[in-house]
Amino acid sequence: MGTVSSRRLWWPLPLLLLLLLGPAGTRAQEDDDDDYEELVLALRSEEEGLADALQNGATATFHRCAKDPWRLPGTYVVVLKEETHRSQPERTARRLQAQAARRGYLIKLLHVFHDLLPGFLVKMSRDLLELALRLPHVDYIEEDSSVFAQSIPWNLERITPARYQADEYQPPNGGSLVEVYLLDTSIQSGHREIEGRVMVTDFGSVPKEDGTRFHRQASKCDSHGTHLAGVVSGRDAGVAKGASLHSLRVLNCQGKGTVSSTLIGLEFICKSQLVQPVGPLVVLLPLAGGYSRVLNAACQRLARARVVLVAAAGNFRDDACLYSPASAPEVITVGATNAQDQPVTLGTLGTNFGRCVDLFAPGEDIIGASSDCSTCFVSRSGTSQAAAHVAGIAAMMLSAEPELTLAELRQRLIHFSAKDVINEAWFPEDQRVLTPNLVAALPPSTHGEGWQLFCRTVWSAHSGPTRMATAMARCAPDEELLSCSSFSRSGKRRGERIEAQGGRRVCLAHNAFGGEGVYAIARCCLLPQANCSVHTAPPAGAGMGTRAHCHQQGHILTGCSSHWEVEDLGTHKPPVLRPEGQHNQCMGHRGASTHASCCHAPGLECKVKEHGLPAPQEQVTVTCEEGWTLTGCSALPGTSHVLGAYAVDDTCVVRSRDVSTTGSTSEETVAAIAICCRSQHLAQAS
């Protein structure tokens, strides 16, 4: 069906108002969806006209999927500002309908959101976007788009800790205290793997299948959801064999859904929690679409309600940050590996990667329940299967410790993962340092780890190449930012610092003139009852350099950072090893501001480790001893060819350029400075 650009259908105003607002008109609209869809198609305008219209004073913003084939023009999610009253979404929708009617347009209100986020879903012409964006209380509007299932018993052995591996999979518990909500296709609940373990809800919000000749064969409609339900809690092939599942159908028989249907499914979960709160809750999102601000915002709202969300990274062999819900910081995002712990390849595609991935899990040739019959099994691959593994592991961890927060759960998943087992050469070169080399595993025990100081590394997005460009990395609300570092592949950067923004501390990195951009790297830790602050020493201008101290009683140094305004600091040569008793201060270049991150917390104990080698050195590392956790990672100040410093697990990595290309002399030293901490009091108490 073709589209007609910039056409309006003029209706008598009384008739339009009767259709839009009257009860009989409302019923007529509900009974004639197909005719309405044709009308929406007829009313679509050309893309070029929208950009000019939105520049004429609209206060809200418009968003759409970056992947054109996945876009669904004519359907829009209108999101209101957070502080709006609960009644405002419906009132704003009715106001939009009335104003559109005066202009001769028909609008259909599809859904009103109250519990998940304030907003509503409408079908309307693109000609009305400018009008909608100008409405009071509107924050932004997002065009609907498609989401897709991400699937194209070594897996159970792989997630069992090496010291406990045996001929039989023996998890610490079955995850019986946890409910898992699965947003997927329908499920064959009578399969022997999951019979009696799955509650098929009455929720269903799916688009029609593509193609007029598509046959909705039951076994095909149920295949993806049935397999994943079996991976999560199947009797024979499941990870958490005691977890109960709730099935919400948001994908059609072709494994295709929409952002809006996923939103409505998430709101269904939100309402269910309000009506009848339960214990720990895990939501499995084995689907992916283009980046969606509104879907990520919805995930954030659920996470605030202590719901754990686990999502597939996507099967596009691409940066996971370009997809949703994988890009949402509050979501635990999972990539896929094979039996050799290598990234999964799916034809010309494969698992997604990058800084938005938290960890990887088994995702190739996974045996699970088949919808072909009640006793059939099938092998499937993809990041959906990987996410199902992590959802099962999360269920067991939450059963052992039901009060775990999302931040605590994520930190434990990272801490207990198998480390440095993935061949990073599979990833694009610019993504290797950003992608975590972690494969999910069960904890070796369910007790005795409460004293452990857990930390993780969070990378920012790339800053861009302009001189004043900055990058920002932030921790989760329940985490403490203990240190901040920066990295630039060109080596042209102006350092980093910790700054307070909106009541939270963030890590900022600064690009330099002629630089290609910079990353900020935050070290985010779980430190209960901590009182942290940053102490800054301004540029000294002369002498050996600047020194920033932790001068408050009982405060301990957890990280050092520095930033400068000039393009070239030059070099100076402080000693690599600090004098004994000087572990509460940071040293910096005389032309830079130096920042000491200092914390007071019960039982906190920290020490500094340094390792230096004469240049040229492509990489220098220093690692904390067992029982100690890396909280700070920095480079020797004033070394001209250093690209930056970052933490990989409990190892501080400093990267540098070849001195032959920089004009520097090999007399310079490349040094990595690590600050290692532990919670001594809690360790003794445990």
From Swiss-Prot:
Residues 1-28 form the signal peptide. The keyword Lipid metabolism applies. Residues 75-147 form the Inhibitor I9 domain. Its EC number is 3.4.21.-. Residues 29-150 form a propeptide. The record marks 150-151, 216-217 as: Cleavage. GO terms for biological process: apoptotic process; cholesterol metabolic process; low-density lipoprotein particle receptor catabolic process; proteolysis; regulation of neuron apoptotic process. GO terms for molecular function: apolipoprotein binding; low-density lipoprotein particle binding; serine-type endopeptidase activity; very-low-density lipoprotein particle binding. Residues 153-459 form the Peptidase S8 domain. Monomer. Can self-associate to form dimers and higher multimers which may have increased LDLR degrading activity. The precursor protein but not the mature protein may form multimers. Interacts with APOB, VLDLR, LRP8/APOER2 and BACE1. The full-length immature form (pro-PCSK9) interacts with SCNN1A, SCNN1B and SCNN1G. The pro-PCSK9 form (via C-terminal domain) interacts with LDLR. Interacts (via the C-terminal domain) with ANXA2 (via repeat Annexin 1); the interaction inhibits the degradation of LDLR. This is Proprotein convertase subtilisin/kexin type 9.
